[in-house]
Amino acid sequence: VLDYLEEKGMLENTMIVYTSDQGFYMGEHGWFDKRFMYEESFRTPLLVRLPGGKKGDVAELVQNIDYGPTILDLAGIQKPEEMQGESFLPLLKGEKAPEWRKSLYYHFYEYPAEHMVCRHFGVRTDRYKLIHYYNDIDSWELFDLQEDPSEMNNLYGKPGTEEITKELKAELKRLQEYYDDPIRKEFVIE
């Protein structure tokens, strides 16, 4: 594809995106699937070649809901007001994006279904992740992704985690409100 674009003189006028809709477990956490909020499924590959773009990594938290706004921005089209997500074009250009997000929201609700994955929602920051399993259970998980990148040590309820848990729950409530997730009315976070 790259050779063709270069041959036709289109390479320097084309944004190339390689991505996926989700990651996948290959035995991690005893799972062979997707759906849970653990990093193996939550993180997705995203490679972007932008003519004149910055080479290297982007450390900011980007979601697949940002793809549309980014492509519209590149085309010079303003995103519709009702469209979720933000353009990460400034990040690709090596610029500082104004007021970039500090957290990501996740919600899996297809239960019961053939996969039998418990309903859960959560919030992830650059360092921490808080997950709440709900419906027929009420269970929480808290992970320090710097100290435990494999998410094997649940810190929820452990001494010394009270403040970060409180902050993450407040952020979780804020994100549920921001995305207008109806679950916030059924399962109120305390």
Predicted regions and their residues:
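Structured segments of extracytoplasmic/periplasmic soluble domains
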Residues: 4, 8, 74, 158, ...
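Active-site-proximal N-terminal segment of extracellular/periplasmic enzymes that hydrolyze or transfer
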Residues: 5, 150-161
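C-terminal cap/loop subdomain of S1 sulfatases and analogous C-terminal strand-loop tails that border
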Residues: 22-28, 49, 54, 65-68, ...
